[in-house]
A protein has these predicted regions:
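Bacterial lipoprotein signal-peptidase II cleavage site
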Residues: 19-28
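Intrinsically disordered, low-complexity serine/threonine-rich segments
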Residues: 22-23, 99, 128
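Mid-to-C-terminal functional-domain signal that highlights helix-capping/loop sites
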Residues: 27-95, 105-479
């Protein structure tokens, strides 16, 4: 762990590791579906969507197919079979990096990216940068991990043969607790996985003070208070942003300030157990039920791994070391993959405390102490200039950090509703109905219901995240 702490100090930046139905009672006043084209609401509200920039990464190099040559394989093993944090690399290892850079195989640049992520030695960084430029071209700084990885993502460069073994060697040399994640039978695309800047959260269940690990500390079964108790203090103001959850008639508010610190909650509400990850990097709070699973499967306890996939936090299950897709809720490695575990999602509403507590007067809310005295306000600070981790090519229909409410239709096709446009249209008296999905105000946020007023599961996120995990998504309103 000492190596990782040194890396954290050197980097000196606080990072966040980055269907339909439901249990809520039906909403009685479901709007009637509007007539005419669903994506062209009538009324006075003027839609003005902030579109994104198209980034020209140039022409992708051609990658070969098949196995690595014996010489390239030997060089690859040489640069990954030692302690990656050992400073400096030997001359033989530096020569091996140069040799791979002249191989003409762009697939090897993924390994350069992985090593560069943990590199503090200037000589090694230069060697990796020169080799990356030799493989991919000179139009960028090959020693810049972000610039290199953005191109690999945008170009969809294939991974080299045996990539999982090389990546396991690199990451486990930094933190041994990551090694079980690199399971050969898993379904992770390891190209997309990178270090989020923190170590793994392996706090025991129900022992989560948050002060005992150099990690993003989850909280289990958090202490809560009533609206009356909350209003006695001055911590929560009417404008405080919260994530609202209502299950079987029981409501709870999770202040964003706390979720920016904790990023993971394991809780019970309305008789249902669930895990609630919040990815600060992709603006996404989600609820995944962790009960009603197949016989023999114990309740999953979700934690933050310290890793990211395309700037989305990678969560894992504490007792089985099974990696989960945080955005999609399915197990990707380990015993829970073997069991075919797909968690059921529940709606989360982003609202202000004032509007949520007025609409849900019996709601509870997490207590201030869970924020550990921290107030990151990432949106106004760290993330004010856009994503801080590589995301590759993006869908330019919206700016990358515009909020959308993402929903998967019954036929499996995705659609995203631009949040600000939807709120503006609804406040102007318009109705929004697309394929039986009706968007309504909730607190001062939005949620989706069907034509009978039943909840349709959805969650909010930044556009770049939703559109990358759902590449063929529709967008409302149409651009």
């Amino acid at each position: 762990m000492g190596k990782l702490l040194a890396l954290l100090a050197a980097i000196a930046v606080v990072l966040a590791a980055c269907s339909s139905g439901g249990d809520d009672a039906a909403i009685a006043d479901a709007p009637e579906p509007e007539e005419g084209p669903a994506n062209e609401p009538e009324g006075e509200f003027e839609f003005n969507l902030p579109t994104g920039a198209v980034i020209d990464f140039g022409t992708a190099p051609v990658s070969p197919e098949g196995d690595l040559s014996p010489e390239n394989q030997a060089a690859l093993e040489l640069i990954t079979s030692t302690d990656i944090d050992e400073l400096p690399f030997t001359n033989e290892q530096i020569e091996a990096i140069g040799f791979l850079g002249e191989s003409g195989d762009p697939r090897l640049a993924w390994v350069f990216s992985d090593i560069l992520r943990f590199t503090r030695d200037a000589g090694r960084a230069v060697a990796l940068g020169d080799a990356s430029n030799a493989l991919l071209g000179d139009e960028f700084n090959g020693s810049d991990w972000g610039a290199l990885t953005d191109r690999l993502l945008a170009w969809d460069i294939p991974a080299p043969p045996g990539y999982i073994d090389a990546k396991r060697a690199i990451y486990s040399s930094i933190l041994s607790e990551w090694e079980p994640f690199f399971e050969p039978n898993g379904i992770v695309d390891w190209r997309f996985v990178s270090w989020g800047g923190v170590r793994i959260d392996d706090q025991p269940y129900n022992d989560t003070p948050g002060t005992t690990c150099n990690c993003i500390p989850a909280v289990d079964n958090p202490e809560v208070m009533t609206v009356a108790q909350a209003n006695e203090g001055d911590w929560l103001t009417p404008d405080t942003v919260i994530f609202g959850v209502e299950i079987n008639g029981e409501a709870r508010a999770y202040p964003r300030q706390i979720m920016e610190v904790r990023e993971m909650v394991n809780d019970t509400l309305g008789g249902r157990d669930f895990g609630m990850p919040y990815c600060t990097l992709c603006g996404s709070a989600q609820v995944w039920f962790t009960d009603n699973l197949p016989e023999g499967i114990e309740r999953p306890i979700l934690r933050t791994s310290g890793l990211l996939t395309r700037s989305n936090k990678v969560m894992y299950e504490l007792n089985t070391n099974s990696v989960f897709d945080t955005f999609l809720g399915n197990a990707l490695t380990g015993p829970l993959l073997e069991a075919g575990i797909q968690l059921e999602q529940h709606t989360v509403v982003t609202s202000s405390w004032g509007a949520w507590s007025e609409e849900h007067p019996d709601t509870t809310v997490l207590v201030e102490e869970l924020a550990l005295g921290r107030d990151f306000d990432f949106r106004a600070n760290r993330d004010a200039d856009g994503p801080i981790f590589p995301i590759g090519d993006v869908d330019p229909r919206l700016d990358v950090q515009e909020d959308v409410l993402g929903i998967i239709r019954e036929d499996g096709t995705p659609i995203a509703f631009h949040v600000n446009s939807a709120i503006g249209a609804l406040q102007a008296g318009q109705t929004i109905s697309v394929d039986g999905i009706n968007i309504v105000l909730s607190g001062d946020g939005i949620r989706a219901i069907d034509d009978d007023g039943n909840d349709i599961v959805g969650h909010q996120s930044f556009w770049f995240a939703w559109s990358q995990f759902n590449e063929d998504t529709d967008l409302w309103p149409e651009v």
